[in-house]
């Protein structure tokens, strides 16, 4: 650590002990960036370009130190100088470049691409203010800007600029890079394009701003409010700015390597992460034709370069843009898209596979499927539903294009970084092979009946719960009991993820306690979720949870047995405290609606037991751990799809014929709730559950209550519960993103790893 010591002195003319935490952080930032630069970058003839609207990378300091192999040395140096690395981490702002599972997956994938020595890059946008910072005021979500870019940051200007044409004007870009460290390997770049005139001062009244002022607003926010025409067009401006820069950058890199553009597929493979980057297809064709390549050949070249990952079964999430919008924003792409559509209609005249439909809507996913060489789902069930239901018409045409790549998570962040005690204990039992070969965790199974090992796992969990308790007190002001069961649901707020189902369970327990039925073990229900600013019902669910939080906290008859806490501004940093502390992992989406999920994997890896439906990757978790080590409830995906096809689900029938369900649903608009909450929000949510309930909350309620009660009862047998924990940890190896990326490379990308 002599170099670090010298750097600190050179910067501040004092030793580390005399420095503030901010000074130490800035010195470590410079030191770590230098270390990454010296280690070098992955390169090769052919590269993967992973293009995504979001990268939820989290704080980078500790993760980079771990991947560089110097975390322990730095932590020891700081301790010698009276500093704690945890305090230094608190100084670092979390990059506001993502929101949910899509962005976190992209971040995990970059970590694995670098660790496996694959030549690759991530490409996205440099958002200044993120999605938004969530505040709770008057038991409602309030959105404010979430700035993160400081004078000293992980961003490095790359000295690269392109011109992006729009209708009536063009914009110059500037490229900034963030280094993504491979574990004991070289780094790769996350390339983030920005505009030079982004003006954060134009934001007012929360996150309101002039959506028409593209010169100054283009890279301010991730997913700007699209509830009006200007917001929807701004999203198109953003997406095209991202893909035009990406396309120009990719062609530049290939050309510098001596690529004849007819052979672009030998130099580049582009992974389109969801539909936001779909315009890369017509944009690449435009650029190739400008370079003298005939249209049909350009389309053929692009279709050998682009691969598409589908992340959703929700039809509304598959982007469809009105042609009028495209004419207003990127008119030069319209003739290309029309020509691509004509080529498809000449071969496949059926309406349901058209790129441009009869309403003049451009279907981005359809373009990706027709002009990409690979289409993958992200969990076995998800891919099966795509092939047999949602994208069946395309599967019938292109069966060879479809494949599954079950999602994964990087164990470097979600175990080694966020749970040092568990990592160290696993290493003491089975060595450190699991850090690069995650399936080696199965070696833990030989300890599943070892009482000393099981007791130690429980001890580590208790310590994690104490740390989490401190975090929750500082975040919410609510003091929770570390000896209670931690039942956690942390994910984007959406009706299909069914936070409202969990809330109804909490209401049922509240009513039981008020009726004199005391639980044998106290429970803490923990939520973390942001609702999209224009998603009214999702914000109503947050209001319900915050109202219940206060109702329970202030009731002396109930509070000793049960607490509900809603973490404010849930992000990666919060997740790193919550995953290690969890006992019961809530994965309760309506079967057939969650593509995969990755929170389920992070909980499992940290020794939580899943309570969930047979949806997404829960199916594969269930197969791996066996029925004794997971709690499964709810209607099957087949039955759910059948209900939608027949339109025969009626929540009102269930509500009117089930006394317990009616009592719980009606409690939402009871006198107690209305005295604390807002009548409009609570009545709207009540009406939604009774009259619509599109995601079949009431259908699964009774089974959910039964299985959740069973899980809470089983927790009392500590040895058996610890065995469930151990089996979950041991079987989590399949869900390493290293495995996922190896499969992408073997089946889709065909890159040569660096020696």
Where do the PLM segments sit?
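A conserved ligand/cofactor-binding region detector
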Residues: 1-755
């Amino acid at each position: 650590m002599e170099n670090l010591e010298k750097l600190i002195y050179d910067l501040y003319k004092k030793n580390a002990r005399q420095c503030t935490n901010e000074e130490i952080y800035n010195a470590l930032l410079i030191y770590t960036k230098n270390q990454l630069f010296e280690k070098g970058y992955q390169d090769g003839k052919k590269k993967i370009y992973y293009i995504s609207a979001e990268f939820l990378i989290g704080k980078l300091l500790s993760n980079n130190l771990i991947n560089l192999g110097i975390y322990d040395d730095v932590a020891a140096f700081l301790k010698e100088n009276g500093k704690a690395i945890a305090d230094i981490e608190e100084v670092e702002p979390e990059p506001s470049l993502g929101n949910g599972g899509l962005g976190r997956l992209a971040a995990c994938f970059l970590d694995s691409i670098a660790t496996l020595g694959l030549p690759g890059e991530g490409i996205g946008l440099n958002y200044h203010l993120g999605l938004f910072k969530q505040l709770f005021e008057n038991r409602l979500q309030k959105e404010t800007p979430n700035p993160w870019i400081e004078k000293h940051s992980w961003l490095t200007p790359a000295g690269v600029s392109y011109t992006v044409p729009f209708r009536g004007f063009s914009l110059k870009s500037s490229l900034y890079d963030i280094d993504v460290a491979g574990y004991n390997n070289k780094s790769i770049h996350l390339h983030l394009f920005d505009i030079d005139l982004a003006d954060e001062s134009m934001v007012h009244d929360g996150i309101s701003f002039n959506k028409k002022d593209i010169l100054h607003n283009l890279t301010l926010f991730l997913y700007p409010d699209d509830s009006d025409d200007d917001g929807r067009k701004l999203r198109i401006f953003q997406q095209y700015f991202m893909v035009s820069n990406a396309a120009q950058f990719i062609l530049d890199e290939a050309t510098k390597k001596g690529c004849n553009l007819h052979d672009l597929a030998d130099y580049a493979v582009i992974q389109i992460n969801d539909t936001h980057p779909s315009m890369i297809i017509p944009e690449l064709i435009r650029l190739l034709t400008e370079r003298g390549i005939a249209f049909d050949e350009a389309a053929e070249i692009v279709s050998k370069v682009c691969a598409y990952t589908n992340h959703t079964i929700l039809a509304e999430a598959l982007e469809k843009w009105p042609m009028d919008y495209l004419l207003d924003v990127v008119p030069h792409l319209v003739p290309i898209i029309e020509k691509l559509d004509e080529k498809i209609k000449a071969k496949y005249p059926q309406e349901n596979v058209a790129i441009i439909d009869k309403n003049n809507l451009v279907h981005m996913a359809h373009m990706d499927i027709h002009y990409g060489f690979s289409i993958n789902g992200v969990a076995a069930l998800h891919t099966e539903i795509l092939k047999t239901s949602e994208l069946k018409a395309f599967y019938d045409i292109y069966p060879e294009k479809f494949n599954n790549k079950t999602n994964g998570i990087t164990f470097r962040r979600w175990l080694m970084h966020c749970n040092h005690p568990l990592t160290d204990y696993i290493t003491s039992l089975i060595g450190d092979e699991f850090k690069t070969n995650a399936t080696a965790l199965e070696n833990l199974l030989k300890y599943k009946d070892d009482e000393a090992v099981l007791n130690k796992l429980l001890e580590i969990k208790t310590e994690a719960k104490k740390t989490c308790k401190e975090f929750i007190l500082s975040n919410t002001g609510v003091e929770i009991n570390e000896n209670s069961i931690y039942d956690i649901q942390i994910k984007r707020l959406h009706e299909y993820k069914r936070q409202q189902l969990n809330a109804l369970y909490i209401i049922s327990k509240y009513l039981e306690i008020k009726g004199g039925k005391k639980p044998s073990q106290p429970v803490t229900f923990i939520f973390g979720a942001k609702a999209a600013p224009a998603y009214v019902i999702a914000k109503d669910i947050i209001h319900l949870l915050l109202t219940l939080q206060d109702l329970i906290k202030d009731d002396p008859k109930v509070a000793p047995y049960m607490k509900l806490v809603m973490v404010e501004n849930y992000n990666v940093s919060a997740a790193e405290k919550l995953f290690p502390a969890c006992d019961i992992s809530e994965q309760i989406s309506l079967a057939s609606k969650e593509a995969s999920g990755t929170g389920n994997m992070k909980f499992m890896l940290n020794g939580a037991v899943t309570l969930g439906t047979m949806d997404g990757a829960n199916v594969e978790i269930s197969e791996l751990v066996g029925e004794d080590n997971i709690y499964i409830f709810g209607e099957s995906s087949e039955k759910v799809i059948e209900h939608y096809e027949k339109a025969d689900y009626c929540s009102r029938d269930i509500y009117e014929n089930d006394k317990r369900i009616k009592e719980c649903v009606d409690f939402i608009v009871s006198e107690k709730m209305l005295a604390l909450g807002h009548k409009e929000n609570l009545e709207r949510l009540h009406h939604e559950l009774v009259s619509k309930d599109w995601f079949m909350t009431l259908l699964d309620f009774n089974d959910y209550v039964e299985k959740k009660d069973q899980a809470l009862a089983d927790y009392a047998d500590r040895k058996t519960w610890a065995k469930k924990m151990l089996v979950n940890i041991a079987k989590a190896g399949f869900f390493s993103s290293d495995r996922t990326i190896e499969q992408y490379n073997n089946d889709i990308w065909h890159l040569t790893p660096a020696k």
